[in-house]
């Protein structure tokens, strides 16, 4: 993700409720699990997606802690 995309993503996250943030986090965790499984099986072609999903999860957790 480029800087502008990251800023838009975080801006979008800040507009969501705690429940929506938790739902989005769970979806990304499921995707991360699937990506790790594909990587272990040697089927993952977009290895950078692992890093991107981890960062998105961290951003969601940061926004959640800002609200608390």
Swiss-Prot record:
SUPFAM superfamilies: Ribosomal protein L29 (L29p)
Pfam families given in the database record: Ribosomal_L29
Annotated signal peptide: none
The keyword Ribosomal protein appears for this protein: yes
Cited InterPro entries: Ribosomal_protein_uL29 (IPR050063), Ribosomal_uL29 (IPR001854), Ribosomal_uL29_CS (IPR018254), Ribosomal_uL29_sf (IPR036049)
Domain of life where this protein originates: Bacteria
GO BP term, pick one: translation
Entry's Gene Ontology molecular function annotations: structural constituent of ribosome
Keywords: Ribonucleoprotein, Ribosomal protein
GO cellular component annotations of the record: cytosolic large ribosomal subunit
HAMAP family linked: Ribosomal_uL29
Similarity comment text for this entry: Belongs to the universal ribosomal protein uL29 family.
Name of the protein in question: Large ribosomal subunit protein uL29
Species: Streptococcus sanguinis (strain SK36)
């Amino acid at each position: 993700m480029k800087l502008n995309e990251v800023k838009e993503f975080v801006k979008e996250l800040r507009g969501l409720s705690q429940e929506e943030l938790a739902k989005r986090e769970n979806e990304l965790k499921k995707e991360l699990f699937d990506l790790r499984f594909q990587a272990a099986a040697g089927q993952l072609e977009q290895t950078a997606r692992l890093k991107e999903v981890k960062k998105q999860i961290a951003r969601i957790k940061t926004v959640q802690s800002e609200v608390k």
